[in-house]
Structure formats: C-alpha cells, structure tokens
Amino acid sequence: MKQFVLQYLEKKGYPVKDYGTYSDESVDYPDFAHALAEGIENGDVYPGIGICGSGEGMAMTLNKHQGVRAGLAWNKDIAQLIRQHNDANVIVLPGRFIDNKTAEAILDEFFKATFEGGRHERRRESAP
C-alpha cells in the first residue's frame, strides 16, 4: 500500500517525505511513527500519512506527541470527519483492511476536507 500511496501523492502533485520502511522485513512501527511525528512537530511535514496493519498502533504512537492529531480512517466518511471535526494533521490507513481503491478515496476526502472550527475548535483545544 505504501508504494501506491507514494504514487498517488506524486500524481496529485503533493510533496513527499518518506520516513520508511524501505523493505518487506518486519519492523517496529513506533520507530516510523516517532519519525513522522517529529516531522509534524517541527513543521517539515503537513499533513502526514501513516500506514500499518490495523492502523491502531501507529495512531496511538503518533498521538503521544504534542501537536499531533492522528486519526485512523478506514472509509472516506471517517477521513472527512477526522479533518472537519478533529482537525487531524495525520491520517493513518489500516493497510491490512483496505485496498488501494479505498485508500485513494480516503485520501481524496482527507485532502479535500477542512476543519470546521466552532464547537470543534473548543474541543480540540481542550485535548492538547
């Protein structure tokens, strides 16, 4: 799925910064989540995309970082809501559970949606 996402981003003209992994070997996803989170925190990357099997471990690790608001999205409706209501600055895809076509629809919606503010801003601010 990662290669598909990279090609999707390039096709759409989005800048790409690849934090790994670079092989099919088993890896520890927190290493890559921390690298992505640091990119978000220091302004090198916005927004970010994380991919792992279920997406949960990546999202949990990313959300341990101040200023990172990672949301797990398995369909385009969730992708829209994590932007509109939660101001997600990272989307996490569950690579084992979605196909490339679904990933493309999810990313299209994530990039199209914008934060609505209002009551959602108050909620966002209360969860640092």
Listing of model-derived features with the role each one plays in the protein:
Residues 15-26:
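A short beta-strand-loop structural module common to alpha/beta enzyme folds
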Residues 76-128:
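C-terminal binding/interaction regions
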Residues 3, 59-61, 102-103:
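Short glycine-/acidic-enriched loop or helix-start segments at secondary-structure transitions
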Residues 32-50, 54:
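Short, structured active-site "lid" loops
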Residues 30-34, 74-75:
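Charged helix-capping and loop-helix junction motifs
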Residues 7, 34, 38, 60, ...:
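Alpha-helical segments flanking ligand/cofactor-binding loops in enzyme cores
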Residues 50-96:
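Mid-chain, well-packed structural core segment of small domains
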Residues 1-15:
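Glycine-rich phosphate/diphosphate-binding loop of Rossmann-like nucleotide-binding domains
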